[in-house]
Amino acid sequence: MTQEQKKFIERVGALAAADMQKSGVLASLTIAQAILESGWGKSGLTVKGNALFGIKAGTNWTGAVYSGKTQECYDGVTFTTVTGLFRAYGSWAESVADHSDLLSRNARYKAVIGERDYKAACRAIAAAGYATDPKYAGKLVQIIETYALTAYDGAGSAAKPSGSNTTAGTTR
């Protein structure tokens, strides 16, 4: 893990852990999604719009928007680049709060809220259609395990990284 990645995880992890106490969304899931969706905070969406999660700005969204390109997989095989309008925020904290609010307000994400097993949470968010990538759940699980993100889920969590020998010095 690079120092930059470590700092990203620590920054988003603090926000996600605090948010988990209010929302019931596992911090490890939130961090993994932020890593995957924002490219470690380097995507144009994140740099210009503080958007960590690539949430599209639907017709009900009244906040700021950012136009950007994204990859969508409509047939389960082929990825297509499309341009869309995405939600933009004043800060990463606002992005994390809106992410959990989106999950909490939409019935399709009901299985994610309060789930304590990170693998089940990853499967649930993918099954609910958060992303079009058919390998989305597996990618999230791999990120959580590679970077031992369940440490942010708090004591007493049923979630345990399968590679419990993962250390901060591990590179990937």
Question: Whereabouts are the PLM-identified features?
Answer:
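Catalytic cores of secreted/periplasmic lytic hydrolases that degrade extracellular macromolecules
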Residues: M1-R172
